[in-house]
Amino acid sequence: MATLHLADMGADVVKIEDTEAGDYARAMGPARGRSSVFFQLVNRNKRAIRLDLKQPQGREVLLRLAKGAEILVEGFRPGVMAKLGAGYNDLAAVNPRLVYCSITSYGQDGPYADRAGHDINYIGYAGVGDQIGTEEAPVVPNFQIADLLGGALTPVMGILAALIDARSSGRGRHVDVAMTDAVFAHAILLLVGFLEHGKTPGRGTGMLGGGLPCYNVYRTRDGRYMAVGALERKFW
């Protein structure tokens, strides 16, 4: 999604896939033609090539691409790109202006750095998962909060800021984004509750969490649901 936003804004995005299975998203869900609908949606406006980065020839192609690029985005676990000879220092040596963005689950170091994860893990560790649902139990949101906030919007913001600086200073940067950290940084009301009261807000309570009748969801007679958002008296 991060590179999709860049592509939609006009960037020439070249997506690199491995030479065997390629991007597994090609087979995710119903297909339309040779690839899944999901794959086509998130890879619109992109070009694609297949490279085996474990082979010298594949690495050489990547280095040539990086030499003429402004941005590189990678989503491997920490250290993988460096082992392939394509870490930030390797590519900065051939293109000092390169903005190199790494998107990981839990950051480049720390006790969880090498762990894999999915959206549900990231929002759980960040405390957001505990805030979604009713007093009885949390729910699994059918909207990937961490993947989109931490894996797309936060990286794009960092990339664009670094790109502006690189164009004026001539020096690129390593933009390091941990999806769990990005979610936690945006959990403002959760943090406010903890700092003010020493505990996080109860699930299904509070002004924006379902504790008020003027900001809630109600089942209607015809079996649908109605969202009411009238916090201010003038709207009620």
Name every feature range the model reports, one short phrase each:
Residues 1-174:
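N-terminal helix-loop segment corresponding to the beta1-alpha1 unit
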Residues 125-236:
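Acidic, glycine-rich segments within the central catalytic cores of soluble metabolic enzymes
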